Amino acid sequence: MKLALVAVGQRLPAWAETACEDYLKRFPADWRVELKAVKAEPRTQGKTVDAMKAAEAQRIEAACARGVRRVVLDERGTRLTTQQLAQRLQAWQLDGRDVALLIGGPDGLADTLKDGADETLRLSDLTLPHAFARVLLAEALYRAWSVNAGHPYHRE
């Protein structure tokens, strides 16, 4: 199974890049985990929010492999504990389909992506800056993997 974090926005503060890369590198070699950053639509006059989200949605779709399980990150998604995320990660692995976890841009994700998602999860009840969302997702996935692997990173 391949696990892709597909996020709108290519520039992050150095600390966020470093943290996200660190968590993704911690996965064992047989886990194919990657970050795919897609270009945010420029916020210029004359463009509606829906038009900008639609342009970003096209870039997200292009970054996702065909037949991939699409998991949208949204504040209205399902709330999971670490143990529940570990169970979900294990179920995805057993299913065998590649998984793309989608993080929207400043205005969120287009409704077409939300409506077409296989699942919608939330990272927090709070609205998070994109840099935090990427780091938090990478850490949460690594922690979930560690639970399933019996690795000492996670402690109850």
Swiss-Prot record:
S-adenosyl-L-methionine binds at residues 73, 104, 123-128. Pfam families: SPOUT_MTase. It comes from the Bacteria. Keywords: Cytoplasm, Methyltransferase, rRNA processing, S-adenosyl-L-methionine, Transferase. It catalyses: pseudouridine(1915) in 23S rRNA + S-adenosyl-L-methionine = N(3)-methylpseudouridine(1915) in 23S rRNA + S-adenosyl-L-homocysteine + H(+). One of its GO terms (cellular component) is cytoplasm. Homodimer. HAMAP family: 23SrRNA_methyltr_H. Specifically methylates the pseudouridine at position 1915 (m3Psi1915) in 23S rRNA. This is Ribosomal RNA large subunit methyltransferase H.
